[in-house]
Each structure stands twice: as structure tokens, then as C-alpha cells.
């Protein structure tokens, strides 16, 4: 029914699925162009458009909305405005857009890197740190993307200028294994494991984000690591259609660093069949 209905619409005014980019980075990444091509070839018209533009689309996939942290209020309002159109549940994405979700997962029994959320007031930050035995710690914005403004400090060091960090910050212990072991990302489609990669920081770098020239390595992971990551997803009130579970493997145990439910890089081009698996799960969502 949906496929037949779409043929009656002016393609210049309407499309079945919009994969949103952003005004800051409007170009579509190549691996998502392959998703667009496969979906369109299979009868699901798909376009790219910045999330800040007016959308006329049944479904929205915000996988390249890479600037939302800089326009957070507008972005969350946009999600609420189009809440019934998103591939992933809107309430899950709103929850996931602020790193306070890590505290929730911690409270739900997930093995999460210890996380404190507090205001940007120096006195509050120092009070929070006093009760922690962290020789080194990391401070980052509570709303942030791609490792921006992530800073490592030693106890007693002067805090950086926090004027660009927003209203709240995240405090976490520095985990040296991130630099040595890298960060392992497990990608799931509708709760089913698809593939995994490891982001390995270069020498003398400890951040595992792409802007820091990490090496992206496809990896096989042990079944118990997959089960641990899957367990994280089953803690959620709804199962996301797509999810990336990021963590560091320390002594063969998975320590959760991040759960990405909005605009994760899915590394579809790094594993044979990954694009096809993603397209299949999108089709099932759209055509059900």
C-alpha cells in the first residue's frame, strides 16, 4: 500500500524517507548514499536534507545530524514536532541526547564508566571530585558530539574555560585502556547484532573519536561481549531500530562508554552485508 501510494505523489514535494544531514555539514556521507540508492531501487523514495529544513516525509532518519549539540533546543523541539516520523522512537532519542542517560543506565545495573553530571559551576565540580578517588578525570559537555571539548585533567589542575560547555558537564575517571585497547563499537539492528569495529587512537592520543585520526578496524568479538551489549539494549523501554553500543574491553569485560541512538556512524562500508542488513530492517519498519 505505501509503495503504491508513493507513486501518486510529486517527488519534488514528498518522499517516503528523509535521511537528515545538517546545515553545518550538508553533504551526505558515501555509505548513506548507498543506503539511499538501495532503498530507492526497492521502491522507497529516499532523499537527503538538513534537519533544519522543512521536511515533507513519512519517515525521518537523522544519521547525519552532526551539529545538533550546537542547536540543542531547536533540535529537541524538532524531534518533538516530528515525533511520530522517526525510525528510532523519539522519546529514546530525546533521552539519549543528554549524557545523563549514562547515569540512568548505571542505576539500571549496566556496567558503565562511572559518571557524574553537574553544573558548570567550579565549586560544584570541585565538590563532586573531592569524593572520588580519580587521579585523572575527563570533563566534557553533557550535550556534545564527536569528542568536542573533551578534556583530560589531573586532580588539582585548573579547570578549563567552561563557557562553551553549556549548562551541565560530565565528569568521569580517565580510563587508560581506552588509549591502549581502543573503543569497540557493536552495531545492532532491531536488537540483533550486525557487526563490530574498533576505533584505535593513534600513539599519544587517548580519545577514540574520528576527528582524532583513529584507525577503524573491523573486529570479531566474543559472544559474551555481544550478549553484554545486547543486555544494555534490553534495559531500554523500547527496542531501537538501530543502535551503536560503544565500550572498552578490559580483562575480557565490556565497560560501556556510550550508547548511540541518534546519529551514530554505523560503519556500514566496513563489513560485507552490513548495508543490506540495515536496508532490510528499514524496509520492515517503513512497510509494516
Residue ranges and their predicted role:
Residues 17-21, 78-83, 87, 91-181, ...:
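Active-site nucleotide/adenylate-binding loops and adjacent lid/helix of ATP-dependent enzymes
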Residues 112, 171, 242-244, 256:
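Hydrophobic residues on conserved beta-strands that form the core of alpha/beta folds
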Residues 238-240, 249-288:
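C-terminal active-site "lid" helix and adjoining low-complexity regulatory extension at the edge
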Amino acid at each position: 500500500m505505501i509503495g503504491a501510494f508513493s507513486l501518486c505523489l510529486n517527488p519534488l514535494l514528498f518522499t517516503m524517507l528523509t535521511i537528515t544531514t545538517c546545515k553545518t555539514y550538508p553533504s551526505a556521507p558515501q555509505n548513506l548514499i548507498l543506503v539511499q540508492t538501495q532503498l530507492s531501487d526497492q521502491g522507497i523514495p529516499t532523499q537527503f536534507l538538513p534537519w533544519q529544513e522543512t521536511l515533507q516525509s513519512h519517515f525521518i532518519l537523522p544519521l547525519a545530524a552532526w551539529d545538533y549539540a550546537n542547536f540543542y533546543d531547536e533540535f529537541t523541539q524538532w524531534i518533538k514536532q516530528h515525533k511520530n516520523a522517526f525510525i528510532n522512537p523519539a522519546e529514546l532519542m530525546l533521552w539519549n541526547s543528554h549524557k545523563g542517560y549514562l547515569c540512568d543506565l548505571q542505576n539500571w545495573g549496566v556496567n558503565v564508566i562511572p559518571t557524574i553530571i553537574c553544573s558548570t559551576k567550579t565549586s560544584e565540580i570541585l565538590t563532586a571530585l573531592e569524593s572520588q578517588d580519580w587521579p585523572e578525570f575527563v570533563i566534557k559537555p553533557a550535550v556534545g558530539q564527536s569528542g568536542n571539548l573533551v578534556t583530560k585533567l589531573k586532580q588539582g589542575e585548573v579547570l578549563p574555560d567552561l563557557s562553551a560547555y553549556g549548562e551541565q558537564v560530565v565528569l568521569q575517571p580517565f580510563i587508560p585502556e581506552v588509549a591502549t585497547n581502543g573503543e569497540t563499537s557493536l552495531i545492532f539492528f532491531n536488537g540483533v547484532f550486525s557487526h563490530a569495529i574498533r576505533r584505535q587512537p593513534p600513539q599519544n592520543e587517548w580519545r577514540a573519536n574520528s576527528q582524532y585520526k583513529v584507525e577503524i578496524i573491523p573486529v570479531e568479538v566474543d559472544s559474551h561481549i555481544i550478549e553484554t551489549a545486547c543486555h544494555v539494549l534490553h534495559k531500554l523501554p523500547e527496542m531501537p531500530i538501530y543502535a551503536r553500543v560503544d565500550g572498552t574491553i578490559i580483562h575480557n569485560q565490556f565497560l560501556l562508554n556510550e550508547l548511540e541512538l541518534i546519529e551514530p556512524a554505523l560503519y556500514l562500508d566496513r563489513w560485507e552485508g552490513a548495508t543490506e542488513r540495515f536496508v532490510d530492517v528499514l524496509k520492515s519498519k517503513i512497510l509494516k
